Amino acid sequence: LPNDCASTPDTWLGIVSSMTPPQDHGLDLGPLTGVHVVDLTSNVAAPFGSAILADLGADVLHVEAPKGDDCRRMAPSSGRGSAYFSIVNRNKTGMTLDIRIAEDRRTLDDLIAGADVFVTNLRPGKLEALGLDTSSLNKKYPRLIHASLSAYGQSGPERDKPGYDAVLQARTGIASVTGEANGPPVRAGVSILDVGAGTWLALGVLAALYERQTTGRGSAVSTSLFETGASWVAYHLAAHQVTGKPSQRHGSGHPAFAPYGIYRTQRGEICIGIGGDHLFRELCEAIGRYDLIDDERFRSNGDRARNSGELRTELERTFESKSALEWASQLSDRGLPVDAVNQPEDLLTDRQSRETGILQEIVGPDGRGMRIPGLPITFDGERPRFRMPAPDLSDADRPSPRD
């Protein structure tokens, strides 16, 4: 997989070590050991994608402007940077360059010459102006894989528009189908487009590395928040074309299944996912509501979906007798797909988190240890480990020609 170009690994490490001391991580870092990545990105989406490559063992160098990646200043922040920056730049080494300065631009060119993958999230027009677009790079480095992530894509009239996760959730219709039926459109509670686009970017790089083994040539990999958002609403697009009806908000429910969603209990909420008639019968028997089994409003999944509001009323009348944890335990024991609604921080003490090893220790923005999710993939039962924290901004006070 690694690029067999003129710049040797020793040259690469020599450049990197001028800013960040090399680390002894052992021989087997992961499946991408030996792959060199130059990461000229900022904010969240593209850095998240290159963090996946780093987790898989790639040697990822995060290149920042002298004033630092904007992600360093995202709240909450302290000390080394922000919580966000710690997450999306883990397992990377770091360097600051002002590529408007000739010397720094030559350094960047040297880094790219020694890389297998070059990751960017500048707008397409800016890449072209800098001579960092795929066409320019391919002429110099035919084996290089250029991976780019933008807001609206590499083509089309809006390719150079700026955009963030929430903006593209609105544009692609995700916000319009999120929230309660009688409420306003809502942004999803996690940055699903940032994380999704970053994941697609990493997947594309892996495919391009595999292809290069056969062709000997690099390729251009691109994705965007817009394209990712479009892919997330595939069901809604298909449903509209089948029924002719506009998409709607259903709260925590689902238009095709019932009961499916979040229900109030005596204390807290539970989430139930019933996708078939046999499971509905099991649920009714488990909660002692035999009358609902033969109720004509709820006899089939289609009936229940059409009458989901009435079904919710009936179920919550029963659920108010116990807490969410009690119901979750009772119904899970019957083999039903149900769980209590938790806070994200509950994962820190969750037994399943502990047993799967999904949470790993890393140095946080305040210099203290914190636990965050590692890569949600294991290889032969082993999860790729965190090898180093996000890099310090080691050259933040360097003068800039525009200061």
Language-model segments: residues:
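N-terminal helix-loop segment corresponding to the beta1-alpha1 unit
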Residues: 4, 10-217, 362-363, 391-392, ...
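Terminal low-complexity tails and localization/encapsulation signals of metabolic enzymes
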Residues: 17-36, 247, 264, 346-403
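Glycine-rich beta-alpha junction loops
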Residues: 67, 152-153, 225-230, 267, ...
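Oxidoreductase and adenylate-handling cofactor-binding alpha/beta cores
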Residues: 198-218, 231-243, 284-290
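Conserved PLP cofactor-binding pocket of PLP-dependent enzymes
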Residues: 332-353
